[in-house]
Amino acid sequence: MRVLITGGAGFLGSHLTDRLLQDGHEIICMDNLFTGSKRNIAHLMQNTNFEFLRHDVTDPFKLEVDQIYNLACPASPVHYQYNAIKTIKTSVMGAINCLGLAKRVNARVFQASTSEVYGDPEVHPQPESYWGSVNPIGIRSCYDEGKRCAETLFFDYHRQNGVDIRIVRIFNTYGPRMSPEDGRVVSNFIVQALRGEDITIYGDGSQTRSFCYYSDLIDGFVRLMEQDKLVGPVNIGNPGEFTMLELAEKVIQLTGTQSRIVHEALPADDPKQRQPDIELAKTELGWEPRVELDEGLVETIDYFRTYLDS
């Protein structure tokens, strides 16, 4: 099949590109390179089944494809708060453009949504049926509400125009090709440790997150797109729950550094806990994560060690 991946030069988009090329598909990788990097796709430039298109998903595009994966949007607070208006435009206009293309060419279209649609949840763990607790006017709202609006658009195009949609809600994901400057907790901790710096925890470190290794997540994407029964949304994440203190201690242990842990003020609207209920993915997709946190951290640390040395 001929597949369009928006955000295809990003952390997850580039890994999805690798997987779909291995599966025998032709890939059009679209990215404006705001947070994506040619470094992530440099190894693919000579592949005859791969095409890179530098284009912003908020601008209309016409292509002939069988499937569309919409991954285009800054996904870390550092990046999505840098230009909040651009962030929400990317989620909303990007969704409209992908859905319009899917309608025209009769393609199946996939939306990479987020656990941020649950906000600071009052239900734990979070099932897909939970509507969330989101501040609509806070500093994170450009991302949270943009993704919620994209889900609305996907379901309205599905109901009104019969567009064939799939939606996943991504929980914290990590692995090689994360940017060292993206401000996410795993990359922050690892980079600080490898540089011999103090590890910064915001708040007292009791807040929890669940960390899914990229290869598990990509497998969930593909399983959802390849079946004809389930539209979504589907939580894709690792239900193993860790405090920020536990994560920092693991990183210090696995890097073998002498970094100390220091604390700074907690940012506004930072969720206190986040853990996916993955029963739907397990029963309908036969999916569950395989990579344990320590195993994934070792691979990610090795990547960053090489990256920083270069």
What residues fall within each predicted segment?
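A short beta-to-alpha transition loop/helix N-cap that caps and shapes the active-site region
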Residues: 36-38, 119-120, 177, 244, ...
